[in-house]
């Protein structure tokens, strides 16, 4: 059971976003997809979830084409875009999420909202940038999909909320082991969480190895 990218390439006009990327994300591991802004991280995840089409190459989720209903139902991507109506209240959005994700844990979502002090009766467009991110993370953790994809997940969060999120993420993983991919440029913050590291730079994979191996070799994203 895995996500498999085979020879993925993507260009935007004259800009190379991804070049011949082959990569596997296996179940039951926390991955770090690490790289500077513009390295190609978001493009890769958007191709996986059908928001972008590759120029060449294929993507499969547990053997099914990534753009199939069978595959998409196993994925949850937290990105910059909010997928709920701006004037919808947070509480109503949780109700909606429970309809689309059969394993959605509503009581857990409300528990997370309480810990993060997320106001359930506030409209989504009334949330600050930080609380907008918190809302998306609450839904993501409670959705319990087999593959959780987090693209710069702590955008706008203060230090306290970032640490609370990382702690909750690890607790959630320990209770329900699944494939989690953390795409970020904040390398130091996730170093103790990730088991396997993928380093991407200018659309190419530089390293794809267990985190311990790269740490022992003193690898850095800035290389």
Annotate each PLM feature.
Residues 148-152, 157:
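Catalytic Walker B motif of ABC-type/P-loop ATPase nucleotide-binding domains
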Residues 79-136:
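ABC-family P-loop ATPase nucleotide-binding domains
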Residues 49:
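Helix-to-loop junction immediately C-terminal to a conserved catalytic motif
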Residues 39, 159-161:
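Helix N-cap at the start of a conserved alpha-helix in ABC-type nucleotide-binding domains
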Residues 31-36:
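The feature captures the beta-strand-to-loop junction immediately N-terminal to the Walker
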Residues 57-71:
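Conserved ABC transporter NBD signature motif
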């Amino acid at each position: 059971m895995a996500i498999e990218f085979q020879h993925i390439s993507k260009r935007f006009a004259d800009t190379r976003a991804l070049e011949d990327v082959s990569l596997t994300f296996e179940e039951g591991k926390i991955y770090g997809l690490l790289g500077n802004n513009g390295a190609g991280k978001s493009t890769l995840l958007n191709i996986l979830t059908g928001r972008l089409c590759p120029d060449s190459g294929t993507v499969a989720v547990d053997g099914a084409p990534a753009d199939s209903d069978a595959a998409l139902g196993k994925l949850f991507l937290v990105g910059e875009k909010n997928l709920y109506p701006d004037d919808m209240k947070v509480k109503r959005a949780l109700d909606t999420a429970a309809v689309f994700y059969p394993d959605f844990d509503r009581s857990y979502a409300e528990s997370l909202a309480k810990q993060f002090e997320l106001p359930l009766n506030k409209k989504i467009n009334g949330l600050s940038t930080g609380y907008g991110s918190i809302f998306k993370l609450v839904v993501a953790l409670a959705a319990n999909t087999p593959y959780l994809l987090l693209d710069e997940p702590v955008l706008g969060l203060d230090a306290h909320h970032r640490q609370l999120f990382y702690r909750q993420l690890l607790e959630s993983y320990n209770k329900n082991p699944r494939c989690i991919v953390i795409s970020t440029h904040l390398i130091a913050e996730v170093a103790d969480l990730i088991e396997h590291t993928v380093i991407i730079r200018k659309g190419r994979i530089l390293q794809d190895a267990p985190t311990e191996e790269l740490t022992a070799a003193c690898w850095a994203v800035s290389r």
